[in-house]
């Protein structure tokens, strides 16, 4: 906050790092599997790690597959993506007990980008073309209804040729525009 030269937070190769809410510890992902390579098992598995801040690294997950995208729920638990049950779903990991449990069980497509709200205990994530939420303590996942107001699909200005029946003609003071009514509709022309 006071400024100065940036310093390296940790020297392990990794990505998707998130600091713990209390500021002591960085959860991150190590591994080189492309996220699009579903079902990979091998040496490049993506696993969750914790850098404690005092130089110690702790491997958090040891699933023979990919664990990815950690997000802190509170100071002692994370949510993350895992394909432990086939498709990628949201799981919760308790750092104190080591317990891992599923928060979602979607079958059709992989879940993407889970993010926990530390204050509200809510996890939001993307599934197909929608945003979903689930309670960090566990609940039935809920698809959010998002209505986005949009512009009209067509231009409201319509060009037509008016024939017989024009009435109520008025010309602008500078003589560049003329307005008139045909069958109860107002028309403006140059």
Walk through the language-model features, giving the residues of each.
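A flexible loop/linker signature enriched in serine peptidases of the S9 family
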Residues: 1, 8-17, 24-49, 53-68, ...
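Short, basic/low-complexity N-terminal boundary segments at the transition from targeting/disordered tails
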Residues: 95-99, 104-117
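Residue-level detector of Asp-centered blade-edge/turn motifs that repeat once per structural unit
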Residues: 21-22, 73-75, 118-119, 173-174
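Structural signature of eukaryotic scaffold interfaces centered on beta-propeller domains
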Residues: 20, 115-117, 160-172
């Amino acid at each position: 906050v006071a400024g100065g030269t940036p310093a390296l937070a940790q020297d392990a190769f990794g990505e998707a790092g998130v600091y713990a809410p209390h500021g002591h510890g960085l959860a991150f992902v190590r591994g080189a599997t492309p996220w699009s390579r579903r079902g990979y098992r091998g040496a490049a598995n993506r696993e969750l790690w914790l850098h404690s801040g005092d130089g110690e690294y702790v491997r958090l997950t040891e699933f023979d597959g990919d664990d990815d995208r950690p997000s802190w729920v509170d100071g002692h638990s994370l949510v993350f993506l895992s394909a432990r049950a086939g498709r990628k779903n949201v799981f919760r990991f308790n750092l104190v007990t080591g317990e891992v449990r599923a928060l979602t069980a979607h079958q059709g497509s992989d879940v993407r980008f889970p993010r926990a709200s530390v204050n509200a205990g809510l996890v939001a994530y993307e599934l197909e073309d929608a945003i979903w939420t689930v309670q960090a303590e566990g609940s039935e996942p809920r698809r959010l209804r998002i209505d986005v107001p949009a512009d009209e699909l067509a231009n409201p200005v319509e060009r037509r040729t008016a024939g017989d029946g024009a009435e109520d003609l008025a010309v602008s003071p500078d003589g560049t525009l003329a307005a008139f009514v045909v069958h109860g509709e107002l028309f403006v022309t140059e």
